[in-house]
């Protein structure tokens, strides 16, 4: 990255999922993460299967503001609005849910009640590919314009305090 002029400043686990021990290792390399964190009831969960007696739990946590230090010793820039999802069961049988641009904007409206809060979302760039047949570009514009209209200020995440 650095050879091409990029300076990585934060870590985001793929789809926010990694083991508790991996999460604990990240701050050695990246003090900051940019994500909705998944927390576990154990540093070494034996099973997350709900039908197993005594199973461990994992839960994703949305924060409306920066967390300077959490249980895993990471600084967290929050992704708290979610991400657009289209029902593309015909292409990918595991992608059968819908989370709309309006859902993102509804969450941004809710985020306004937090003083100095965030309106941060993730948008998969592949939704912009015309061959997928989704209104990705229009929805992306709707989200940007809607969040701007709500009065949020756009900042470079690497400068977020």
Locations of the language-model features?
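Active-site-adjacent pocket scaffolds in enzyme catalytic domains
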Residues: 15-112
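C-terminal domain-boundary segment and adjacent tail
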Residues: 2-4, 27-51, 115-161
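CE4/NodB-like, metal-dependent polysaccharide N-deacetylase domain
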Residues: 1-17, 107-124
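The substrate-binding groove and active-site-proximal loops of carbohydrate-active enzymes
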Residues: 7-14, 87-98, 124-134
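Generic structural hydrophobic/aromatic packing signal, biased to beta-strands
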Residues: 11, 75-79, 121, 147
């Amino acid at each position: 990255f650095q050879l091409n002029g990029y300076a990585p400043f934060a870590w985001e686990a793929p789809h926010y999922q990694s083991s508790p021990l991996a999460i604990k290792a990240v701050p050695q390399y990246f003090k900051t993460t940019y994500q909705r964190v998944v927390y576990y009831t154990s540093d070494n969960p034996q099973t997350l299967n709900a039908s197993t007696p005594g199973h461990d739990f994992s839960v994703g946590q949305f924060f409306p503001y920066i967390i300077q230090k959490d249980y895993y010793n990471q600084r967290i820039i929050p992704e708290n609005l979610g991400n657009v999802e289209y029902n593309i069961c015909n292409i990918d049988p595991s992608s059968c849910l819908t989370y709309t641009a309006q859902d993102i904007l509804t969450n941004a409206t809710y985020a306004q009640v937090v003083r100095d809060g965030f309106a941060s979302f993730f948008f998969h760039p592949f939704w912009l590919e015309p061959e997928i047949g989704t209104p990705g570009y229009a929805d992306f514009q709707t989200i940007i314009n809607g969040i701007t209209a709500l009065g949020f200020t756009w900042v470079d995440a690497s400068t977020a305090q």
